[in-house]
């Protein structure tokens, strides 16, 4: 398999990108890597060229660039060239730590949507602290600020496939992020989406979930509109990290006995911190496009890059994209019936 890598995307590119790719190359013997980037910057960083190819580019999409304009105008950028390699069949997957909006645009307009998917979505695996499984899928994280009920329904399908194929969860359960657990909670979009998902034969829907319950493990897939999902993700991550910081500060200020107790608890704190560390978790996936497209945090280091390569490898090995396409192709009538029922409900 071949992975097209945007070597210039990210706060620490190209150094940490190249370091991560070399770690992954040594870890996985069946992956070839295509590094797209500025030759004078990338070439000196590679210590071993085994299964690594450099494709020189002359432009870089910066973090502050307007996504669609950058994709269209910077045709020789590392990100666009890597996306085109996937589109043209020269690579099997696309990786970047760069501009999220530009990567979304490249994934949708260059790699292309899976036929039958209305809107691709951004998904990630978050830690589950009390559930049956260690992780759950959370989507959409901001690919679509506003979503229709039919989009949320499709996210349930896409998220279920990711949970089963990549996380190895059998018969994953699905919940809808809302401002209350009751069926009649939320705005009209979420009320209608709840009814559509409730009657869905495509996945195992358990109802609504509130943001405070996200990490409790009550669902294997949590579906949200992009605005709510992005806000909930950042609030959850920020709160968790701040709590760990405050606990550590309280221990340090509690005298000798407190510090001794803190030393005993150190392994537990490290375990929790590791679960929350994006460098360990891998990247966010753009689900609903014709090939694996994965984005790591902009400040990701080599460890995150290497771990994300393993994540992409699993997606390819488990035929995630082709299985989604096959499911949609063979359930066209079911999906269309759901949309028609939705339209009838809206117009009633």
Curated annotation (Swiss-Prot):
Pfam families: FA_synthesis. Keywords: Cytoplasm, Lipid biosynthesis, Lipid metabolism, Phospholipid biosynthesis, Phospholipid metabolism, Transferase. Pathway: Lipid metabolism; phospholipid metabolism. Its EC number is 2.3.1.274. GO terms for biological process: fatty acid biosynthetic process; phospholipid biosynthetic process. Disulfide bonds: none annotated. InterPro entries: FA_synthesis, Phospholipid_synth_PlsX-like. Its main location: cytoplasm. GO terms for molecular function: phosphate:acyl-[acyl carrier protein] acyltransferase activity. It catalyses: a fatty acyl-[ACP] + phosphate = an acyl phosphate + holo-[ACP]. One of its GO terms (cellular component) is cytoplasm. Coiled coil: none annotated. It is found in: Cytoplasm. It is an enzyme of class 2 (transferase). Signal peptide: none annotated. Belongs to the PlsX family. Catalyzes the reversible formation of acyl-phosphate (acyl-PO(4)) from acyl-[acyl-carrier-protein] (acyl-ACP). This enzyme utilizes acyl-ACP as fatty acyl donor, but not acyl-CoA. PANTHER family: FATTY ACID/PHOSPHOLIPID SYNTHESIS PROTEIN PLSX (PTHR30100), PHOSPHATE ACYLTRANSFERASE (PTHR30100:SF1). Homodimer. Probably interacts with PlsY. This is Phosphate acyltransferase. It comes from Leuconostoc citreum (strain KM20).
